[in-house]
């Protein structure tokens, strides 16, 4: 990875709070320090798991140790996988395509089933208030810089296409199916991916390719 990568995790704050994804266990200390610097884990109401690949779910057990009240949200298969990964009881909410979770203050999260992108249990999460679509690995890239967003298209374009061809291209039919479901959502202002900068300035150009 000549330009590095990032492991992205997100906090959605409404009347209730959701944490979207965790990180890889090899970054345990850095992640947990960052998370607890941003929020008291006792305030996390929901832990949304986009899929159970280790770089997104590797610290679920650690988060639940500090936030035992959190309800884990995921596809049916994801919840089943997690049971075998963390070996402990946990509160859960199984969601399917079109299901919604109201966090309050206008933050209604709608879930999009996106299997095989590139894990069998993948879901996207769409926040209708902020128009942010959390897509896990889809539309991501292995690229790391000081920029949070895709404000330098020329710098990221090569890595974006390479990532797509390696991870998403083999599942092109699944990509098209997910995009059809995405089209049923409201306007998408930002694509918050699991790796690399978030797409804000080139959403149409990059997700349409």
Model-derived features: where do they sit?
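Conserved beta-strand hairpin/beta-sheet module of binuclear metal-dependent hydrolase folds
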Residues: 1-37, 124-127, 131-135
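Active-site metal-binding motif and surrounding structural segment of the metallo-beta-lactamase
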Residues: 15, 26-73
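Active-site neighborhood of phospho(di)ester-bond hydrolases with catalytic His/Asp-centered motifs
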Residues: 20-22, 44-52, 72-75, 133-136, ...
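Short, glycine/acidic-enriched loop or turn micro-motifs at the edges of active sites
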Residues: 24-25, 54, 140, 198
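Metallo-beta-lactamase
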Residues: 74-201
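Long, charged amphipathic helices and adjacent flexible linkers at domain junctions
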Residues: 203-209
């Amino acid at each position: 990875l000549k330009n590095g990568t990032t492991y992205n995790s997100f906090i959605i704050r409404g009347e209730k709070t959701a944490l979207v994804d965790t990180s890889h266990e090899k970054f345990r200390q850095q992640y947990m320090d960052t998370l607890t610097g941003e929020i008291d884990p006792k305030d996390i109401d929901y832990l949304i798991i986009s899929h159970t690949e280790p770089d997104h779910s590797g610290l679920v057990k650690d988060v639940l140790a500090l936030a035992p009240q959190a309800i884990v949200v995921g596809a049916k298969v994801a919840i089943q996988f997690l049971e075998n990964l963390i070996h402990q009881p946990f509160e859960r909410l199984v969601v399917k395509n079109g299901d919604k979770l109201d966090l309050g203050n206008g933050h209604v999260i709608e879930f999009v089933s996106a299997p095989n992108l590139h894990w069998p249990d993948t879901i996207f999460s769409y926040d209708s208030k902020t128009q942010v679509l959390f897509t896990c690995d889809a539309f991501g890239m292995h690229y790391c810089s000081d920029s949070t967003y895709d404000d330098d298209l020329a710098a990221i374009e090569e890595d974006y296409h390479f990532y797509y061809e390696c991870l998403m291209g083999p599942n092109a039919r699944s990509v098209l199916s997910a995009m059809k479901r995405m089209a049923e959502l409201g306007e998408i202002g930002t694509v918050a991916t699991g790796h690399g900068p978030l797409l804000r300035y080139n959403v149409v150009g990059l997700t349409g390719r």
